[in-house]
Amino acid sequence: YTTLFRSFAEREKKKRKRVGYMQIIFIHHSCFLVELDDKVLIFDYFDGDKVEGMHFTGKLPSYEPDTKIYMFASHSHKDHYDMDILRLADKYPNIHYIFSKDIRISPHFLSKHGIDPAVRDKVTFVSPDNTYHVDDLDIMTLRSTDAGVAFYVTSNGVSLFHAGDLNDWEWDGAGDLINGRVRRAFRHEIKKLSEKPINVAFFPMDPKLMEYQFKGFDFFLQNTSAEFVFPMHMWQDYSGITEYKKRLSNKEMADRVIEIERENQTFAFGENY
């Protein structure tokens, strides 16, 4: 268990309300599980062997059958979505799914894979630039610069942002025209969050971008009020987090970035949060 930066929380506590119990588990890659007082939110879970050439080891914990669980999938890529999560409805009758509309689950498709088509009644499909209310969750979606959506979610007095694949994807060889278009689209979306409170954010820091690994992360930190930011989409290489924090001259900005060391790492929020 890692208790998140009590000193930072102490400095900042006058700026925000106490939100009660919150615990976060980094499952793997871009999957995070958020436990609140009366519910569990799970973002972009997939089984660890579904991505070719990778073996992710994170596992979802078990809960009481009547637990309220909300599973988010930002888009259909194999490292963000796994059809088998729909089978969890057999174990948890109070589960609800929030899926980007690019995820296709027709009744015929579900039946073909041995999943009860009735599970569709537990799915809310979302599109970019919209707002949704699911039970007591308020959800705003942003448009990804790759596929699907990013999620801004508020519940229990907590504001969360999960970027999905929304990032400043600058690739060598893509050319200035394409990279510039992606950057403008990315910044346009992130600026929609500039006036939003964000207690916790999950944002890409992809080492495959090489020298551009931190560009999107920089812009996100500088243009939002996110208090704790978890790097993600790191393909099991977490070395960039320490490097990035050392590069930041502003200590308070560096303190906002959470250091992840391993899959299934748990982060408990202290009393002052």
Task: Outline where the language-model segments fall.
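Binuclear metal-ion centers of metallo-dependent hydrolases, dominated by the metallo-beta-lactamase
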Residues: I25-I27, A118-V134, Q213-Y273
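Active-site neighborhood of phospho(di)ester-bond hydrolases with catalytic His/Asp-centered motifs
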Residues: I42-D44, T67-Y81, Y97-K101, F161-G164, ...
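Pre-active-site segment of Zn-dependent metallo-hydrolases
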Residues: L33-F72, S76, H80-L88, L166-E195
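Active-site-proximal loop/helix segments of hydrolase catalytic cores
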Residues: T145-Q222
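Active-site HxH/HxHxD metal-binding segment of metal-dependent hydrolases
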Residues: K59-T131
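Active-site environment of divalent metal-dependent phosphoester hydrolases
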Residues: G48-K50, S76-Y81, R104-H108, N130-Y132, ...
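Short, small-residue-biased leader/transition segments that mark boundaries at the very start
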Residues: Y1-L4
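Beta-strand-turn-beta hairpins that frame and shape the catalytic cleft
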Residues: M22, E35-L41, T131-M140, Y152-L160
